[in-house]
Amino acid sequence: MKVKFAKKYGFCFGVKRAIRIAERNQHATTFGPLIHNSREIERLQKDFDVSLSRSLEEAQKFKSVIVRTHGITKDDLQVLKEHHTHIIDATCPFVTKPQQIVEKMSQEGYQIIIFGDNSHPEVKGVASYGDDVAIIANIDELKHLTLKKKVALVSQTTKQPEHFGKIAALLVSLVNECRIFNTICSATFENQFAVDELSREADIMVIVGGKNSSNTKQLFKIAKEYCTDSYLIEDENEIDNTWFVGKELCGITAGASTPDWIISRVQEKIEQI
């Protein structure tokens, strides 16, 4: 089977930074999964004794706590500080940016609108820095909001720029004063553009990444638009040889939290089909 990779894929700057931080802080715990890739989380625990705490109470039992790439809520951060925990901040700088924007705009009296998934830890963290905050998943939800005169818009870092642009355009037409902040990560945009391009060419697409990863699911969604035979897998063990019957070119991309060692194993298995 012939394999072709997307021009941009895999580990982004924020994830690489977080992995380095975790590897330098053995015996610490992360408050929530450091990244959305269970295999890499297992590697960090096995090789560096970096454990995973899923609750604030659990994290407080450790002397050192690593803040996940997606960030945590303002209240949770304050609790850790008051507990005199050694806090190691691995929040992606691209996530810190909308946190700061939301806090500043709220202080200036703006209603905050976040384009994102309300259950995602990044969005929960960003929203915690504002007072009057509405979270919308799509443009239809915006149409049903009661809007104030002054509104500021930010986005979850992994959303599709095209959808954000449409929301921004509608919002401008609805309010007297609107501040728009494009907080979508540049790596997200580049990876999405690359998978869009490759999926138009490939007979089959394999997207490698955590199934709980927002950016990976976005890549899968885009690939599926142009290549109906698209599959989202976490590692090589999920590959089904029957997918490739009658196919000539397999396109591969990977989410921002997918390490190279997993991608290489996937490539090797597909090339042997």
Swiss-Prot record:
Example GO molecular function: 4-hydroxy-3-methylbut-2-enyl diphosphate reductase activity
Family annotation (Gene3D superfamilies): 3.40.50.11270, 4-hydroxy-3-methylbut-2-enyl diphosphate reductase, catalytic domain (3.40.1010.20)
Do you know which Pfam families this protein is assigned to? LYTB
Q: Where does (2E)-4-hydroxy-3-methylbut-2-enyl diphosphate bind?
A: H36, H70, H120, T157, S213, S214, N215, S257
Keyword field contains ATP-binding: no
- Residues engaged in binding [4Fe-4S] cluster: C12, C92, C185
The reaction(s) catalysed by this protein are:
isopentenyl diphosphate + 2 oxidized [2Fe-2S]-[ferredoxin] + H2O = (2E)-4-hydroxy-3-methylbut-2-enyl diphosphate + 2 reduced [2Fe-2S]-[ferredoxin] + 2 H(+); dimethylallyl diphosphate + 2 oxidized [2Fe-2S]-[ferredoxin] + H2O = (2E)-4-hydroxy-3-methylbut-2-enyl diphosphate + 2 reduced [2Fe-2S]-[ferredoxin] + 2 H(+)
List keywords of the entry alphabetically.
4Fe-4S, Iron, Iron-sulfur, Isoprene biosynthesis, Metal-binding, Oxidoreductase
Query: HAMAP family per the record?
Result: IspH
- Family to which this protein belongs: Belongs to the IspH family.
> Per its record, how is this protein called by name?
4-hydroxy-3-methylbut-2-enyl diphosphate reductase
